UniProtKB/Swiss-Prot annotation:
GO cellular component, one term: cytoplasm
InterPro entries: Arginosuc_syn_C (IPR048268), Arginosuc_syn_N (IPR048267), Arginosuc_synth (IPR001518), Arginosuc_synth_CS (IPR018223), Arginosuc_synth_type_1_subfam (IPR023434), AS_cat/multimer_dom_body (IPR024074), Rossmann-like_a/b/a_fold (IPR014729)
EC number in record: 6.3.4.5
GO biological process: argininosuccinate metabolic process; L-arginine biosynthetic process; urea cycle
Gene: argG
Protein name: Argininosuccinate synthase
Keyword Ligase in record: yes
Catalytic activity: L-citrulline + L-aspartate + ATP = 2-(N(omega)-L-arginino)succinate + AMP + diphosphate + H(+)
Cell compartment(s), UniProt: Cytoplasm
EC main group: ligase
Family the entry assigns: Belongs to the argininosuccinate synthase family. Type 1 subfamily.
NCBIfam families assigned: argG, PRK00509.1
Keywords for the protein's UniProt record, in alphabetical order: Amino-acid biosynthesis, Arginine biosynthesis, ATP-binding, Cytoplasm, Ligase, Nucleotide-binding
């Protein structure tokens, strides 16, 4: 193995990264600096994390608050594109990875590290996301991925490894699910979820009520949108992160934002995940409602194309690329008229936009009415239809 002087590890305080600290020191003879990203995973997850890192053998631990930046500079731009991976997944884990990688590189530069490390498995997407970001931001730094090197293959072996070194760890061998949380969402994988025929039990979900346990009375929430960004909730002007937190609090009791999907991983296999994205689901519904009013047909079509490509870009970890900048520039242009107000009804897991208005709305009641009007001459439709269907007519005549 190569020898490094100082390695910055993306540290969570969980079992895997607690074992990685001593493993790096033993196998690479290096000093280990722990880096913890606060992306809104909650105070419970961060409590005592610095002490855990030091107890595991790290010489220092940096906890960096990334919540505001993550929402304003990563989530909100992605929302403007309308990106939804494979029609369902709102990219909660994917959007958080580039800002974590960027902050990790910044800490590495600050402390003079010559390598970076992460606790991603060799089967998952995150190894590609992190290392693609590292390649774009710090191609001179080496990357150590212990899960691709060590012979520790189970939770039991990791616990034994720590016990042999008298390193305290609160994890247990009976943990069922692998979870990842941030301000946007929480993901659940593993356990019985690995069988797609197995219905997830309520113990899987940790954030939202089940629709059955949700209130029997619907709740209305009003969102104000300016150029594709949610700026106010129920009349209260808030920063992006605070808008998200408020909507999470409002939507989660109603069971909003639960999805159970089998997705195509970047590395080639399929995986099943259960995701909870309460506030984000409400935001997306509001932005879609505004788009219905302000985008013409061609613009909506192209936004769908851009959003589909951007969803794959984010999922695949290609944030720091020229393509990302190009698509976001297009999304900005398409969002310049996306200003308005939306009232959404939350009820037993469902979000419905029940009222919407915009100063840039292209909807005209005068043209759309089923009643009598004096702005649309229906006889004009005949000529339009003949021209619109001309190619079909020519093809049919050619077959005679």
């Amino acid at each position: 193995m190569s020898s490094f002087k100082k390695v910055v590890l993306a540290y969570s305080g969980g079992l895997d990264t607690s074992a990685i600290v001593p493993w790096l020191k033993e196998n690479y003879g290096c000093e280990v600096i722990a880096f913890v990203a606060d992306v809104g995973q909650g105070a419970e997850e961060l409590e005592g994390v610095e002490a855990k890192a030091i107890a595991s053998g790290a010489s220092e631990c940096y906890v960096v608050d990334l919540k505001d930046e993550m929402v304003s500079d990563y989530i909100y731009p992605t929302l403007k594109t309308g990106s939804i991976y494979e029609g369902t997944y709102l990219l909660g884990t994917s959007m958080a990875r580039p800002i974590i990688a960027k902050a990790q590189v910044e800490i590495a530069r600050k402390v003079g590290a010559d390598a970076l490390s992460h606790g991603c498995t060799g089967k998952g997407n995150d190894q590609v996301r992190f290392e693609s970001c590292f390649a774009a931001l710090a191609p001179d730094l080496q990357v150590i991925a212990p899960w691709r090197e060590w012979d520790l293959s189970s939770r039991e072996s990791l616990l034994d490894y720590l016990a042999e070194r008298d390193i305290p760890c609160s994890a247990s061998a009976t943990k069922i699910y692998s979870r990842d949380a941030n301000a946007w969402h929480i993901s659940h994988e593993g356990g019985e979820l690995e069988d797609p025929w197995c219905q997830p039990s309520e113990k899987v979900w940790t954030w939202t009520n089940s629709p059955e346990q949700a209130p029997d009375k619907a709740e209305l929430v009003t969102l104000n949108v300016v150029e594709g960004e949610v700026v106010a909730v129920n009349g209260e002007q808030l920063k992006p992160y605070d808008c998200l937190v408020k909507l999470n609090d409002i939507a989660s009791p109603h069971g909003v934002g639960r999805v159970d999907i089998v997705e195509n991983r970047l590395v080639g296999m399929k995986s099943r995940g259960c995701y909870e994205t309460p506030g984000g689901t409400v935001m997306m519904a509001a932005l879609q409602a505004i788009d219905e009013l302000v985008l013409d047909k061609a613009s909506r079509k192209w936004k769908e194309v851009l959003g589909g490509e951007f969803a794959h870009l984010v999922y695949d970890g290609r944030w720091f690329t020229p393509l990302k900048d190009s698509i976001l520039a297009g999304a900005e242009a398409l969002s310049k008229d996306a200003t308005g107000e939306v009232v959404l009804k939350l009820y037993k897991g469902q979000v419905t936009a029940v009222q919407k208005q915009s100063p840039h709305s292209l909807y005209s009641e005068a043209f759309a009415t089923f009643g009598e009007d004096d702005v649309y001459d229906q006889s004009h439709a005949e000529g339009f239809i003949r021209l619109f269907s001309l190619s079909s007519r020519i093809k049919a005549l050619a077959k005679k």
